[in-house]
Each structure stands twice: as structure tokens, then as C-alpha cells.
Regions:
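A structural signal for the beta-strand cores of small, secreted beta-rich domains
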Residues: 680-698, 738-755, 788-800
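C-terminal beta-rich recognition modules with glycine/proline-rich loops and embedded aromatic residues
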Residues: 30-75, 370, 436-546, 590, ...
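Active-site-adjacent structural elements in folded domains
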Residues: 232-234, 283-290, 333-341, 400-409, ...
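Aromatic-lined ligand-binding clefts that engage carbohydrates, nucleic acids, or primary amines
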Residues: 563-568, 675-676, 735-737
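Aromatic (Trp/Tyr) and acidic
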Residues: 26-194, 198, 228-256, 297-314, ...
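Hydrophobic, small-residue-rich alpha-helical packing segments that form membrane-like cores
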Residues: 264-360
């Protein structure tokens, strides 16, 4: 062999090895490039640590270097032709796609009804949540929302920017504005609030000015250089995530708010990004594009399929396909239960987009993907709330028992997106199980994230462990103008569309309506020519039935023949279920099916439904033996959490029914709740059971642990008092039961010893006190005299700096009289209408719906043995 031949051979070997090594360096990953939570990435961006400068320039997959290696080995023309070939093949495949009718035109899917035709009842639980959200949306300032968009476009920036994730230093800025566009469109449809309409129209108009100023179709709150980094697989925080929110918001402004300007803006934006993606594929490869999707891209495929269903533009369909993340959807396509360690809220929107692909193209593979995904999440990764994820990621299948150790369970965004998944599946299949899931996740995972009726106060995570608190998760409650987390964006959307999944229509010869959620509301059903008024009696624990009444009025002089289908939830049972139409009893199907009524509805028709609400336990999704006893307690769709700082042990007798160890709290008990206060040093103090023994603390705000500890149920002998004030109980003997320790009693331990709390069976005469007029002589005060120690009174010790005790000081001592006199007022805390007592091993537990908790500590799962 000649030296020349040897040289050629060696060159070939080196080239071959180089290509192999290049391929190894390119070994594919399917995940997030940056395996970090959003909260961690926000902390990096706001850190002053210089190490961020290193990270920010780190190439997560330094493909340019490998491309240079390949370019040195292969002719440039061949490379260019190969990548151009990739693009040409993609184009040809898209042109061959058989596209069905637009989703709203398809007869095989249930159709959404317009939010413009649905109105929630004011004062209902859902109506209050919607109103709280409306108040927040009206607080938001147009100039502050637009600040970073104007800055990016080189326009004047009046006002000051918002903080949190909308801060000008944060790479995800602008995402909340996209959510605002969607939320305001949905809220306007739900309320027709004129002020909101004016504000959201102004935001769209000014965003259009920004887009025109940039001049390329690009529109965002950050510069397009972020996409240079994205396409180079350099570190950048999810620019397409924000673009998806803006596109989706503008599309909602077009579709829901009927703003024609918004659609033109969307199409121009998509033209810009179509060209960017095409350039990446032709310059590098289709593989390079898919590698970049390992950074979070939100629901880009979803919004692009929706856009295509409006425009019919083949480029929109192609671009949607290119955001279907094949390495993730492929796992689901082959039915691999292998989603562990994926960032949940990165990938659920990809599934939602694949569901839209099915609706647009009819490809059954994508129906199977959505169905399988819902099955594995529900069977392996879901908490009793219906939510999923821990620290923003999925754990191993059926291994969520040890995730209770974290306070960062159930990212709120994931619940928002899982509701979309289940909604699609219900519309395709009409299966009650999907409607039941929707009810559970909406009730526990959405209604739980507002802090009562405080506008703009929401949470990121919903802890599921022992002794946890919404206020004490890693981020706790957000603030109105300095949080703007991803979950604020999905939150304002969720509370703007509470009426969008109550009613669904079905095409066919006769108009058909499915009522799948029992939420007090009016619905103007135009196809059926009737107005439906649904009134739900709020659920209570002492009367375990869901009661719903439907009344009807005619939209025209005569009604049309139509069919109404009413969901029978799987959490009820047939015994005790009733249906009455105009005083005539109906035969009901078994739970998990629909009651179907076909008739010509008339004004004055009345349908009443009654479903028993069952108490039940549900095992945690963990098949390891050490977690076999860990269970949640549910009442219908409501997850019941216990007021406890960590105790969770319950022992039920063998073969005992759940009603044997869980009992409802009667309605009358709220009238028996009081707190006891004194004024001292220009402050109001109350005696509390925050720790044993009892102590005086400053008057707490409602919704806190201290508010619970300061509230006591006044028990009068074996009965209870229903006095308006305790001055009405003068001369009567009472006992005090701590609000969050049902079955326990406040007792004294003898003269000059502190008061403490024991079980009711251990109290004896030490737990009895006589209500007497206040020793300080004021008509509004009372004193509590020991039944067993005449002349000895409950004494605050404020003046002496000591705890609450039984004191027998001289009756002539003015300071003593003042310290033994209290103003008794209605309890700071009160029992939720759905409240139970569960018998525990060490203590009894007060159970209430998770949605009722604000800052209080709670336990969502219990260790139930027996």
C-alpha cells in the first residue's frame, strides 16, 4: 500500500472517528435543558452573585462546536442541501395532512358554549371567586403592564414597571401580560364589565404600536436576542413560553372579545417566528430545532393549531407540528409510563397541544396520547386534590408518599393545564370520570389558591404534607404587584373562566345539552331556545346531600324539543338520590352516568336533584407497604384537611364505617364560639391555646393559627349556650373547648397555677367555670369563677407578665379585678359549613375543606390504621 493510500485511509479513519464522536456528543436528551424549577431560575436572575455571569454564557448543548467539526469534514454544499432537504420534506408532509373541519364545526365532539351566555350567581362560592379576580384585574395599570414592551420597542415608558417576574431584569417578563390578555377577555365575556373592556382594548392597541415600531412582526417584552441564544442552545429563560402567552392572549382577544386588530397581530408574529424556525432548520437541521425544544416552550403547538383552525394557513399547521415535542409525545405514543423527572408544567401544555392536533387533523394517535397521559397521571402522580408535581417535577410512578415531606407540592399551573386535558377528553368521550376529575381539581386545586376574597393574593404551590400551610410554602402568598409568577398568570385565567365548563352542547337533530358541573349560574341556551337557571344549595356537613334546582324560562314564545343530560357524580350513591320534575319523581341511573330528559321545555318547569354526599377515604398514589395506611379524607368532591401542626394518626375500629369515627359539626356550634379579650398598654390581648399552658397574645387576624387558638366553644353543662353575648349567661356553669382541639377542655390546675388543656374525660370539676359579672364593674365584661374553687378566677397575668392562671387574690385589689375581667365576643374563627370531627389516636381532628384554609396549618393526608 502506498503512502498516499495509507494517508487516505488514515484520513478516512480520523473522519469516521470524528463523526462518531460528534454523534456521541450529540446524544439526544428529552427533558428541560435546565433541570431547575422556575423559582430557582428566578433566584438566579435576581442574584448579585458573579457566578451568574458564567452560567448565563454556558452553552447547554454546544452544538455550534460540533457543527463546525462536521462542516470541516463534509462539503458545505452537501450540508446546506441536507438541511434544505429536511425543510422540504417537512413542507411536503404537511401539505399531505388531511385536515378535518374546525373543532367547533365537528359533530363528534361536544361543543363549548360561549361565556357570554353564562352568568355565575353573585354570592355563590364561584361567584365570589370570580368577583375577587375581577377586582384584581381592575387594579392593574395599563402603563405598568406595557412598560417593558415599550422599552423593547424603543418607545417612551410612562409609569414604572411592575416587580416580581415582570421586573425588567427578569427574562420571563411579558408572560403575565399575555395571561392578562386571556384573562381579561374571559372575564369580560363572563361579566361585560365596561371598565375592563376599556383597559384590555388599550393594552391591545398599545401592543400593536410596539409591534409596528419594531417593524418585523416581533412583539415581546424582551429583545429578539433571547431567541438567538435559544436557537444557539445557550442559557435563556424560556422565551417561547412568554411568546405563547402573548399569542394565546391576543387570540383570545380576537375570538372571545371580538377585537379584529388582535388577529392581525398574531398572524404577523407567527410570520416572524415561522421564518426563524425555518432558518434554524435550513441552517442547521431539524434535529437542532427539536433539541432547542428542551427549553420550555409553553403551549406553542396548542395556540398554533387554534390559529390554523381560524386561518387555514398551511404554514400555521406546519409550525404547530414543529412544536409537538416528539421525544416526549413519543413516550406517550408507545404507552411508556416514564414521565418521572420531567418538569410537569413544561410538558402538560405539549399534551394539550397534541389534543388540539387531534381535533384539527383527526389523527387518532393524538387522541390515544391524551388518553394515556391522563391515565398515568391520575393513576400514579396525582394528589387527592387532583393536582400533580413536587418541586415542579414528576416523581417516580406511584411513589408520591415521600413527596409529602416537601412543601412545594402541586404547582398551581399544572392544575390549570390538567383541567384543559380533562376537558378535551370529556368533550370527546362524554365520560363522567373526566367531568368528576374536573370538579375535583377545580374545587380543591383552583378555589384553594385565592386567599379568601383578597384581590391579587394567590399561591404558587399547594402543600400536601403534615402540618403545612399555604402561607409557609417556599413562596407563600404572593402580592398584588410584586409577584407575577407563572401561577399568577394561570390563576387570573382560571378565575375568569369558572363558567366555561358547566354546560356543553351536542350537535344533531335535536338540541342537546350536557350539564356536567353543579355551579349556581344562568345559561342562555340559544340552540334550545331556553334560559336555564341552576341554583345549588351550598353543601354542609350536617345534611349530607347536594341539592340543585333548575328552573326554565323561554327565550322565544314557544320552546323547542331538546334533551338535557345531568351528571350523576361517581362520589354519590343511588340510595337517597332523587330527581323530581314538576312534582313527578324520576328514575335515576347509577352514579357515573347521565340522567337524560327529552321534552319540550316550558316556562315554569322545575327540576330538583338530590345526591347523597359520601364520606370516603382515598389511598395515596404510592404502592410501597410503608405508605399503605396514608389516606386522604373526602366529602363528595371536597378534600378535607385537618387543623393540625403535624399529628396525623387515626385508628379506626376493625370493620367500622367511616361515619363511626368522623362526625359532622352541627350548624348551631358557630353560635357557641367566643374569644376573651383585655385591653393592656394600648393593645388588645386575648387568651390563647397556642401552647400549653394558656397564654395572652395580641389580638390576631382571622385566617391564622393564632386566630384558631384564640377561639373557644362555650359548652353549658352537657348542652351548649346559644347566647348572643356571655353576659346573657351570667350565673351559668360553662366549659371551654379549644376550637381546633374538639373534645378537649380548658382546666385549671389549682390556685396560682396556669390553665391548660386536657381530654374531656380527664377534666372533672377543674374544667367547670361559672360566668359572673366582670369584677371590674363594667357592664360589658364577665369573669370566670372556678366551680371547684369559690372566689378563684381566671386571671390574665398581663400586669404581672405571667400566663393565664387561676388566681384567688384579694377582692379589694383593683389590678386583680381588672386582670380577671374579660370582654367575650364572637369567635375570631368559625366553623366552615363543611366541618367534621375525626377521632384521632392522640387528639381529635377538626376537618374542613382545603379551600377554606388561609394561613392556618393543616394536614392533607392521615395515617389511618384499623
Amino acid at each position: 500500500m502506498s503512502l498516499m493510500s495509507v494517508g487516505r485511509m488514515m484520513a478516512f479513519v480520523f473522519a469516521f472517528v470524528a463523526i462518531v464522536l460528534w454523534g456521541c456528543a450529540e446524544c439526544k436528551e428529552c427533558t428541560n435543558n435546565n433541570a431547575q424549577s422556575h423559582t430557582h431560575r428566578y433566584q438566579i436572575l435576581t442574584s448579585s452573585n458573579e457566578s451568574w455571569n458564567i452560567i448565563s454564557h454556558y452553552k447547554l448543548a454546544p452544538k455550534d462546536d460540533h457543527d463546525h467539526v462536521l462542516a470541516d469534514l463534509l462539503p458545505r454544499k452537501l450540508l446546506k442541501e441536507e438541511h434544505q432537504h429536511d425543510w422540504d420534506v417537512i413542507m411536503r408532509k404537511t401539505e399531505k395532512v388531511s385536515v378535518l373541519k374546525a373543532p367547533h364545526q365537528r359533530q363528534d365532539f361536544l361543543k363549548e358554549v360561549s361565556l357570554h351566555d353564562v352568568r355565575l350567581h353573585e354570592g355563590s362560592i364561584h361567584g365570589r371567586a370570580q368577583q375577587t379576580n375581577l377586582e384584581y384585574l381592575l387594579m392593574l395599570d395599563v402603563d405598568r403592564l406595557l412598560w417593558s414592551f415599550r422599552k423593547t420597542a424603543g418607545l417612551p415608558t410612562p409609569g414604572t414597571p411592575y416587580g416580581g417576574w415582570e421586573d425588567p431584569k427578569i427574562e420571563l417578563r411579558g408572560h403575565f401580560v399575555g395571561h392578562y390578555l386571556s384573562a381579561s377577555a374571559l372575564m369580560w365575556a363572563s361579566t361585560h364589565n365596561d371598565i375592563l373592556k376599556k383597559q384590555m382594548t388599550a393594552v391591545v392597541a398599545n401592543l400593536s404600536i410596539c409591534q409596528e415600531k419594531i417593524g418585523t412582526g416581533y412583539l415581546s417584552a424582551f429583545p429578539s436576542e433571547f431567541f438567538d441564544r435559544f436557537e444557539a442552545t445557550e442559557h435563556v429563560w424560556a422565551p417561547y413560553y412568554t411568546i405563547h402567552k402573548i399569542l394565546a392572549g391576543l387570540l383570545d382577544q380576537h375570538s372571545i372579545a371580538k377585537n379584529p386588530q388582535a388577529l392581525n397581530m398574531v398572524k404577523w408574529m407567527v410570520d416572524y417566528f415561522f421564518n426563524r424556525v425555518q432558518n434554524v432548520i435550513t441552517k442547521f437541521s431539524i434535529s437542532r430545532h427539536y433539541q432547542s425544544l428542551n427549553e420550555e416552550t409553553g403551549g406553542m403547538n396548542d395556540v398554533l393549531y387554534k390559529l390554523y383552525s381560524i386561518t387555514g394557513d398551511q404554514r400555521h399547521l406546519l409550525l404547530a407540528h414543529l412544536f409537538d415535542k416528539p421525544c416526549f409525545l413519543g413516550l406517550l405514543a408507545v404507552k411508556a409510563n416514564d414521565i418521572a423527572n420531567f418538569h410537569a408544567n413544561t410538558h402538560i401544555p405539549v399534551v394539550v397541544g397534541s389534543q388540539m392536533r387531534y381535533e384539527v387533523t383527526g389523527d387518532p394517535l393524538y387522541k390515544e396520547i391524551g388518553t394515556f397521559f391522563m391515565d398515568i397521571v391520575n393513576s400514579s402522580h396525582t394528589y387527592a386534590t387532583g393536582g400533580t408535581s413536587v418541586d415542579e417535577f414528576w416523581s417516580d410512578p406511584k411513589r408520591i408518599g415521600d413527596t409529602l415531606e416537601s412543601t412545594d407540592n402541586e404547582e398551581s399551573c399544572t392544575t390549570y393545564n390538567m383541567l384543559k386535558v380533562s376537558r378535551h377528553l370529556f368533550r370527546w368521550t362524554k365520560k363522567v370520570s373526566y367531568a368528576d376529575y374536573y370538579e375535583r381539581a377545580l374545587t380543591n386545586g383552583v378555589l384553594s389558591i385565592q386567599r379568601g376574597t383578597e384581590p391579587g393574593v394567590m399561591i404558587y404551590m399547594l402543600p400536601q404534607g403534615r402540618g403545612v400551610s399555604k402561607a409557609k410554602a417556599s413562596l407563600g402568598w404572593g402580592t398584588k404587584f410584586d409577584s407575577f409568577w407563572c401561577c399568577y398568570g394561570t390563576g387570573i385565567e382560571s378565575f375568569s373562566k369558572l363558567g366555561d365548563s358547566i354546560y356543553f352542547e351536542e350537535g344533531g337533530k335535536n338540541p342537546t345539552l350536557y350539564i356536567i358541573q353543579y355551579i349556581s349560574s344562568f345559561f342562555n341556551w340559544k340552540s334550545g331556545q331556553i334560559i336555564v337557571n341552576q341554583t345549588v344549595v351550598p353543601a354542609v356537613s350536617w345534611d349530607p346531600f347536594l341539592r340543585v334546582t333548575f328552573t326554565f324560562s323561554l327565550a322565544k314564545k314557544t320552546g323547542a324539543l331538546s334533551t338535557l343530560n345531568f351528571r350523576l357524580p361517581t362520589w354519590t350513591h343511588k340510595d337517597g338520590a332523587k330527581g323530581v320534575l314538576n312534582n313527578e319523581s324520576l328514575s335515576l341511573p347509577t352514579p357515573g352516568k347521565f340522567l337524560s330528559i327529552t321534552r319540550k321545555w316550558n316556562a315554569g318547569d322545575k327540576l330538583s336533584l338530590q345526591f347523597p354526599i359520601t364520606l370516603r377515604t382515598e389511598a395515596i398514589k404510592d404502592d410501597r407497604s410503608q405508605y399503605a395506611s396514608i389516606q386522604a379524607i373526602l366529602y363528595g368532591p371536597y378534600l378535607l384537611a385537618g387543623h393540625t401542626t403535624g399529628d396525623w394518626d387515626i385508628k379506626a375500629a376493625p370493620n367500622a364505617s367511616i361515619e363511626d369515627w368522623i362526625t359532622p359539626i352541627p350548624a348551631s356550634y358557630n353560635s357557641q364560639l367566643f374569644y376573651f379579650s383585655q385591653a393592656f398598654a394600648n393593645s388588645t390581648y386575648v387568651f390563647t391555646n397556642s401552647k400549653h399552658p394558656l397564654a395572652m397574645q395580641k389580638l390576631p387576624v382571622p385566617g391564622t393559627d393564632l386566630a384558631l387558638h384564640a377561639t373557644f366553644r362555650v359548652i353549658q353543662g352537657k348542652s351548649s349556650t346559644n347566647c348572643t353575648t356571655l353576659t346573657d349567661a351570667i350565673g351559668k356553669t360553662i366549659m371551654l373547648e379549644p376550637f381546633d382541639h374538639p373534645g378537649m377542655r380548658v382546666i385549671h390546675q389549682g390556685r396560682e397555677h396556669p390553665l391548660t388543656v386536657v381530654g374531656s374525660s380527664s377534666g372533672g370539676p377543674s374544667c367547670a367555670f361559672v360566668v359572673v359579672p366582670g369584677l371590674d364593674g363594667r357592664k360589658e365584661t364577665i369573669s370566670l369563677e372556678s366551680k371547684s374553687h369559690n372566689g378563684c378566677f381566671v386571671h390574665s397575668g398581663l400586669h404581672s407578665g405571667r400566663g393565664v392562671k387561676l388566681s384567688c387574690n384579694s377582692s379589694s385589689d383593683a389590678t386583680f379585678k381588672e386582670s380577671a375581667s374579660f370582654i367575650a365576643k364572637r369567635g375570631i374563627s368559625k366553623y366552615d359549613p363543611i366541618s367534621f370531627v375525626a377521632k384521632g389516636v392522640n387528639k381529635n381532628f377538626l376537618l374542613e375543606p382545603l379551600l377554606a384554609f388561609r394561613d392556618e396549618s393543616y394536614t392533607a393526608y392521615f395515617n389511618i390504621k384499623g
